[in-house]
Amino acid sequence: MERIVVTLGERSYPITIASGLFNEPASFLPLKSGEQVMLVTSETLAPLYLDKVRGVLEQAGVNVDSVILPDGEQYKSLAVLDTVFTALLQKPHGRDTTLVALGGGVVGDLTGFAAASYQRGVRFIQVPTTLLSQVDSSVGGKTAVNHPLGKNMIGAFYQPASVVVDLDCLKTLPPRELASGLAEVIKYGIILDGAFFNWLEENLDALLRLDGPAMAYCIRRCCELKAEVVAADERETGLRALLNLGHTFGHAIEAEMGYGNWLHGEAVAAGMVMAARTSERLGQFSSAETQRIITLLTRAGLPVNGPREMSAQAYLPHMLRDKKVLAGEMRLILPLAIGKSKVRSGVSHELVLNAIADCQSA
């Protein structure tokens, strides 16, 4: 069992990583006997894990209600968020309740925002079931829903009480979802840890076949890196922005193509290549390093070009609504070397459009 602590003073919390955690009531600490829980999950995951998690919580003496949400990024919306509030109020649940997010990034982000908002804030626990949510979205307290004009535009920074990563969940993950998660894994190597990127080049095949020790190390290393960044910059005023490599481009793809048509990791993968091409055009990054990124993403089964039907010009309106924009100016996360990156502003729109076009025509 691996245990990592996100160090945030009185709001610090553990990330527990192991197989078989859904069999152990202690996995869901700080929940105690007599407490009330609203378990939030999705239509796909409910048949797989709802009864199991409910059973282990009830074994610990916890009173469990549940709400099942529709699947897909398009349902990470204010309308679906309202169904969670309605379920909480109908029971009813008070300020002493705990929300448990059992699912991928959509369930985790939406449940976290519900917890941040319900009666001005209640406790919640992240139980991520996809690789993407295990290595990224469940850690760090970013919670949100989407708006038709932009992804994650309505939300809050709100930390969970704990994160429970049961590696056995990956056995039921569709291959496309596994690949999507690997995009965020590869991101950590590009922005922060060149040695980890090298390890991924050597061990990607083991990850694709869900080799236990390789996957446990991979998730642990990603969570360590994320925990270090969040501890240093919880509210994304500096260092934490680096975790958005590829996201400014990727969010544009998701919004333009319709949420759910491109998985988040797929859009981020193409966006990371666009960021690398932008850095190349600025003379800050070598084409050989870009090719290493492209090769690893391709081996993972991820796209390295944007949608053919989306023109370079179509990216700009979305990118100019990005949350990192300051004084109307885009701020891009650009790689300087494998394992090193920076936030860059003042890049001309023409250069960015040319970098996007490089990826459209490749």
From Swiss-Prot:
This is 3-dehydroquinate synthase. Pathway: Metabolic intermediate biosynthesis; chorismate biosynthesis; chorismate from D-erythrose 4-phosphate and phosphoenolpyruvate: step 2/7. NCBIfam families: aroB. It comes from Shigella flexneri. GO terms for cellular component: cytoplasm. Its cofactor is NAD(+); Co(2+); Zn(2+). Signal peptide: none annotated. Catalyzes the conversion of 3-deoxy-D-arabino-heptulosonate 7-phosphate (DAHP) to dehydroquinate (DHQ). Zn(2+) binds at residues 184, 247, 264. InterPro entries: Dehydroquinate_synthase, DHQ_synth_AroB, DHQ_synth_fam, DHQS/DOIS_N, DHQS_C. Its EC number is 4.2.3.4. GO terms for biological process: amino acid biosynthetic process; aromatic amino acid family biosynthetic process; chorismate biosynthetic process. It is an enzyme of class 4 (lyase). It comes from the Bacteria.
